[in-house]
């Protein structure tokens, strides 16, 4: 009987189930979107029960459409939108409030208070993160402080907390496994990434009882099995878990120290594997856990760019410059350069390395001769410049010079952007055959745990390149262009 690995990719706007075979190829996939809730400006929430329902739906659709029987699944891997926090009742299994999403700013005031109390340095040292509404810890505190009776129940040990991976493993296992992996734990603001424990000092700071927290386990391990009721009568091992960006790093086979990937989605997330050492950042990067496997923990440096693919959507929907995102490449290629135009797409502030939430988008260098083509090209180029900002920070922090950059995500189909990215970085850019690297990473982690794949060397062999973009731009030209970008950033920051 042919066996497969089922990867569950629980994202910010949709849930997907993807079946992979022994060669790491996609056999079939199913996707279902779910509701976004915006109760107040800047707040973003999800219904955790609806997410669970969407997961069950995509599993059923994927297996039936692929004509694969449940007993053909060798293991399940889970990858998830990180930081999003769920708190539920241990007895009823029902969430006591909506899941507060990573994008949500509803805990900004809590963060300001913690910063004012001088906790910033301690948090940075222990977690590798900044005090920010982005991470799970303040979201849990907010739920306990704002939902009636929640704090008392939590103190009595009646509530459980989890990021989305934890919630799904708990549901699939029928409440038997309350676990998370190192990569997800490292995004909570409650986990010490050096001694690999929930940290009492951090928990006291956030007033979160330890009894709520899941057990932290390696990213590739059997955590439990599906209960018959949720998996068509089968007990399938749930065997791999990693946060979405870390899963993509694993799916890109970036196993060596100094290897890096950049995911071009709504935003961009660039991760560099720093091996078994946690590199503290002096340049606005986050230090995070990549994965834990075979008794070892790998660390990574991470840079976040808030606006990437969403800038292309803005050109399409907001500015109505084209009907399909793929047309952006055609327009951008019609002109030799932007003619000195720079677009800084700081629609929601700037991420790494600036961390400035007050700035807004801007455009510079416009003349009477500026056309739609120049404008589109400048917007695409901004993605490459922002990536260079992150890479410069990574090389400065790690002391490692990047040899090649592996890329994935929706915008990598844009050949113009990938070539310009290579030119601006002066580094080859490699696009893989399989772009679904996040789901693939979770599948690999699960497959290794159940012996479906032997080891990481076997996985490395499966990574195949679709196209390699080599830098051909003169160093002087790329330096000049990048200097113009830095000037545009400074001018943008001055206008508030």
UniProtKB/Swiss-Prot annotation:
Top-level enzyme category: transferase
Listed InterPro entries: ATPase_NBD, Carb_kinase_FGGY, Carb_kinase_FGGY_CS, FGGY_C, FGGY_N, Glycerol_kin
Binding locations of glycerol: 82-83, 134, 244-245
Residues binding sn-glycerol 3-phosphate: 12, 82-83, 134, 244
Activity regulation: Activated by phosphorylation and inhibited by fructose 1,6-bisphosphate (FBP).
Residue numbers bearing the Phosphohistidine modification: 230
Record's signal peptide: none
CDD domains: FGGY_EcGK_like
Description of post-translational modifications: The phosphoenolpyruvate-dependent sugar phosphotransferase system (PTS), including enzyme I, and histidine-containing protein (HPr) are required for the phosphorylation, which leads to the activation of the enzyme.
GO BP: glycerol catabolic process; glycerol metabolic process; glycerol-3-phosphate metabolic process
Pathway: Polyol metabolism; glycerol degradation via glycerol kinase pathway; sn-glycerol 3-phosphate from glycerol: step 1/1
Residues reported to bind ATP: 12-14, 266, 309, 313, 410
Annotated positions binding ADP: 12, 16, 266, 309, 410, 414
Keywords assigned: ATP-binding, Glycerol metabolism, Kinase, Nucleotide-binding, Phosphoprotein, Transferase
Free-text function comment from the UniProt entry: Key enzyme in the regulation of glycerol uptake and metabolism. Catalyzes the phosphorylation of glycerol to yield sn-glycerol 3-phosphate.
Subunit structure: Homotetramer and homodimer (in equilibrium).
Name of the protein: Glycerol kinase
Organism: Bacillus thuringiensis (strain Al Hakam)
Recorded name of the encoding gene: glpK
